[in-house]
């Protein structure tokens, strides 16, 4: 029995953080600042909206909301 538990899809209201390895390898990283703040990688951020393969994230800080690819996000577990 090697059936694994299916991964729960990220949706509006999910708490997430950015997976640093996936982000650094992405084309979005080439077009952005290479020195992102640590809170992006530590989390939690809340998904406000999902459109196609992107999610809009709001951090618990006084900073603008940001769009990331869903494949660059991981669920935040406390």
From Swiss-Prot:
InterPro entries: NdhO. GO terms for molecular function: oxidoreductase activity, acting on NAD(P)H, quinone or similar compound as acceptor; quinone binding. It is found in: Cellular thylakoid membrane. The keyword Translocase applies. It is an enzyme of class 7 (translocase). It is a peripheral membrane protein. It comes from the Bacteria. It holds the Pfam family NdhO. One of its GO terms (cellular component) is plasma membrane-derived thylakoid membrane. The keyword Cell wall biogenesis/degradation does not apply. Keywords: Membrane, NAD, NADP, Plastoquinone, Quinone, Thylakoid, Translocase, Transport. It catalyses: a plastoquinone + NADH + (n+1) H(+)(in) = a plastoquinol + NAD(+) + n H(+)(out); a plastoquinone + NADPH + (n+1) H(+)(in) = a plastoquinol + NADP(+) + n H(+)(out). Its EC number is 7.1.1.-. HAMAP family: NDH1_NDH1O. NDH-1 shuttles electrons from an unknown electron donor, via FMN and iron-sulfur (Fe-S) centers, to quinones in the respiratory and/or the photosynthetic chain. The immediate electron acceptor for the enzyme in this species is believed to be plastoquinone. Couples the redox reaction to proton translocation, and thus conserves the redox energy in a proton gradient. Cyanobacterial NDH-1 also plays a role in inorganic carbon-concentration. NDH-1 can be composed of about 15 different subunits; different subcomplexes with different compositions have been identified which probably have different functions. Belongs to the complex I NdhO subunit family. This is NAD(P)H-quinone oxidoreductase subunit O. It comes from Prochlorococcus marinus (strain MIT 9301). The lineage of its organism: Bacteria, Bacillati, Cyanobacteriota, Cyanophyceae, Synechococcales.
């Amino acid at each position: 029995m090697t059936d694994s538990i299916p991964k729960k899809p990220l949706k509006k209201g999910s708490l997430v953080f950015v997976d640093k390895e996936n982000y650094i390898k992405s084309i979005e990283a080439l077009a952005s600042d290479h020195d992102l703040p640590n809170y992006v990688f530590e989390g939690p951020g809340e998904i406000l909206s999902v459109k196609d393969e992107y999610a809009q994230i709001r951090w618990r800080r006084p900073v603008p909301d940001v769009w990331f690819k869903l494949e660059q996000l991981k669920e935040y577990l406390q």
